[in-house]
Amino acid sequence: HANYDLNILANYGIVVQGLKHDSMLESYVWNATATRHDMDSLANKYLGYETIKYEQVAGKGARQISFSQVDLDTACRYAAEDADITLRLHLALWPKLDSVPALRKVYEEIEIPLVPVLAAMEQRGVLIDGDVLRRQSQQLGKRMLELQQQAHAVAGHEFNLDSPKQLQAVLFDELGLQAKLKTPTGQPSTNEEALEAIADTHELPRLILDYRSLAKLRSTYTDKLSSIVNPRTGRVHTSYHQGSVA
């Protein structure tokens, strides 16, 4: 995963030039329909080898420690295996690509040149205006409250717009709307598709859909982005997964 390594080294002022190969991208170009191109999966698939998992050296969940806290002997064995397996995967995968000129061309002229470009984009990050986001979040919250009040007025009483159970009761029991879709357990569905299907039969489903769209904007963007700004750079740093099918 050259992109990851380039970013780690860049954090220490080391700029890598002349990148030639990436075993993850070799696997991706060779078999783009495969679901996994990570080192552990590729080692098992092409080398028949079970790698040391990160959780085995650092733990998992709440008890997981940072790699800097792993004892030196264990860290060295893990890192050495990582380097060794990466080379062995390249030796296994490169002959395959090299034997198919069209695939080699894609790899050498598109995928590999793209690696440092994406790495640079990740390092640069995206400048975020926190003040604008906060204002937008407040505006969204105000509009959501208005939609909530409208929904309560239409239903004739207050209810939780975020509760599928309460929505089922209001829409299908109290208002008597005909459910077009069911959940796996046979209950009337209140997901987006189900509400769209009945939105022309009553105004409440459309109010709920509008409320949900604003709630998603607020939770995913205006509230979330401010919380993931890197305090050192003042930017949001994205991650681009090159070895995947769009």
Where are these regions (language model features)?
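Conserved beta-strand -> loop -> alpha-helix junction used to position metal-binding or nucleic-acid-contacting
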Residues: 15-31, 39-41
